Amino acid sequence: MFLLHTMIRVGDLDKSLQFYCDILGMNLLRKKDYPSGEFTLAFVGYGKESENAVIELTHNWGTDKYDLGNGFGHIALGVEDIYSTCDKIRDKGGKVVREPGPMKHGTTVIAFVEDPDGYKIELIQTSSKKD
């Protein structure tokens, strides 16, 4: 058994693709419209679906906003240089909602960014580099 993907519903697929692909550097792996169901699925990730878990972006036509609730926490991404990554995200128009620094009660360096729908993306420093 292995993880294939996680699905999130998005209100504006173009904005979400711009965020995940242009700002976070993922690739659009595949995209398909389902006219009879009035939805579009787009899969994004950093590598082939056969070798990596990916994110499924589901856009239900005619729905532009979702209640994110309080059950879902975040998606986590490992980065080598969290400080420059946050700078690049900001430069491309992304929203850093928690600046890089040690996590509470620990030493792991983390930051949080937010996608166009308000989903939180945690960035975790994977190397020992700290500014």
UniProtKB/Swiss-Prot annotation:
Q: Which residues does the record give as Ni(2+) binding sites?
A: 5, 56, 74, 122
Quote the InterPro entries the UniProt record gives: Glyas_Bleomycin-R_OHBP_Dase, Glyas_Fos-R_dOase_dom, Glyoxalase_1, Glyoxalase_1_CS, VOC
Q: Which cofactor does it need?
A: Ni(2+)
Biochemical pathway:
Secondary metabolite metabolism; methylglyoxal degradation; (R)-lactate from methylglyoxal: step 1/2
Q: What is its EC number?
A: 4.4.1.5
> Where is the VOC domain positioned along the sequence?
2-126
Q: GO BP, one example?
A: methylglyoxal catabolic process to D-lactate via S-lactoyl-glutathione
SUPFAM superfamilies found in the cross-reference section: Glyoxalase/Bleomycin resistance protein/Dihydroxybiphenyl dioxygenase
Q: Which family does it belong to?
A: Belongs to the glyoxalase I family.
Q: What is this protein called?
A: Probable lactoylglutathione lyase
Question: Organism source for this protein?
Answer: Synechocystis sp. (strain ATCC 27184 / PCC 6803 / Kazusa)
